[in-house]
């Protein structure tokens, strides 16, 4: 390997001249471009960080809203259940009152019909008694006739 000193010195001088020219004309622009790029990247990172914070904040707000909505839904369901129970209780009370009223009416009607039947039975017994007495007065009473009249009277009561 033959290295020539002139060639090495020429290349060192050329490198230093090139470095001087680059420093004078390009180095400041290059540093400015690097700084601008650094600031742009930093601003993008800041934007990303802000967006992350905003997303986190919105996420927490949505979670809080969902919690509130769930609580409201549970409250409304509970109100509906209570209202349904109240309505069921009212219907049950109303039905009990109607049943009691119908039962009382039926009992009153039965009492009335029983009273009418008793009254009719009294009238029938009186009529039969009059009929028996009338026959007894018109005819001479003997035991067999008396027995026959009673049987006829009972048959008349059964027919009616």
From Swiss-Prot:
Residues annotated as transmembrane: 5-27
Membrane topology of this protein: Single-pass membrane protein
CDD domains xrefs: ATP-synt_Fo_b
Recorded superkingdom: Bacteria
Keywords: ATP synthesis, Cell inner membrane, Cell membrane, CF(0), Hydrogen ion transport, Ion transport, Membrane, Transmembrane, Transmembrane helix, Transport
GO MF, one example: proton-transporting ATP synthase activity, rotational mechanism
Record InterPro entries: ATP_synth_b/b'su_bac/chlpt, ATP_synth_F0_bsu_bac, ATP_synthase_B_chain
Keyword Ion transport: yes
Matches recorded under Pfam families: ATP-synt_B
Any one of the GO CC terms: proton-transporting ATP synthase complex
Compartments, as annotated in UniProt: Cell inner membrane
Family of this protein: Belongs to the ATPase B chain family.
Job of this protein: F(1)F(0) ATP synthase produces ATP from ADP in the presence of a proton or sodium gradient. F-type ATPases consist of two structural domains, F(1) containing the extramembraneous catalytic core and F(0) containing the membrane proton channel, linked together by a central stalk and a peripheral stalk. During catalysis, ATP synthesis in the catalytic domain of F(1) is coupled via a rotary mechanism of the central stalk subunits to proton translocation. Component of the F(0) channel, it forms part of the peripheral stalk, linking F(1) to F(0).
Complex and partners: F-type ATPases have 2 components, F(1) - the catalytic core - and F(0) - the membrane proton channel. F(1) has five subunits: alpha(3), beta(3), gamma(1), delta(1), epsilon(1). F(0) has three main subunits: a(1), b(2) and c(10-14). The alpha and beta chains form an alternating ring which encloses part of the gamma chain. F(1) is attached to F(0) by a central stalk formed by the gamma and epsilon chains, while a peripheral stalk is formed by the delta and b chains.
PANTHER family (alphabetical): ATP SYNTHASE SUBUNIT B', CHLOROPLASTIC
Protein name listed in UniProt: ATP synthase subunit b
Species per Swiss-Prot/TrEMBL record: Protochlamydia amoebophila (strain UWE25)
Protein encoded by which gene: atpF
